[in-house]
Amino acid sequence: MKIRQLLISFLLAASTLGATAQVSKTYYVSKPGTLISMMTEEEANSITHLTLTGKLNAEDFRHLRDEFPSLKVLDISNAEIKMYSGKAGTYPNGKFYIYMPNFIPAYAFSNVVGGVTKGKATLEKVILSEKTKNIEDAAFKGCENLKICQIRKKTAPNLLPEALADSVTAIFVPLGSSDSYRYKDRWQ
């Protein structure tokens, strides 16, 4: 009887571990706005660690926010963010908005639902490009599990209101550049 219980416990533990397996993928996005067309819905649902290179825009960030329910780690350190203007970006309620190049879009990983800002709860770590100029309004607001934001830029990008609000996030910057971040507005 004990052997049977032990076997059942072992099988349950093994199936639980399999269900939470890390799924890492790397994609080169040649045309901004086409990330989601490069994979199936099942793939997007299972990815936990995603590395993107190539060209992204606000449409891609909306898909990252809304259609990758298991995403924990995002590396866009070798991606370029292109300009986008339109209603299919990250701004709440489908408002027309102009997203500038190499800016982490406003509401990139948060959304306003019923007047309340909700962040991407699964996101734990993000690695940003050295080309990043701005982290826009509420980009990571409400991402309560975001523990690490690694920025490869030696000079601090502009940090707009509530960009990192509601999260206790460790910011990792290149060696010798901590003063650039420490003395820049909103980075204190």
Summary of predicted features, one role per range:
Residues I3, V168-Q188:
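Extracellular/surface-exposed low-complexity segments
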Residues K31-M38:
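Surface-exposed ligand/attachment interfaces on beta-rich extracellular proteins
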Residues V23-K31, T48-L56, L71-G86, Y91-F103, ...:
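Structural signature of tandem-repeat unit edges
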Residues M1-S24:
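Bacterial Sec-dependent N-terminal signal peptides
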Residues M38, S46, N57-R62:
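Accessory end-domains appended to solenoid repeat scaffolds used in host defense
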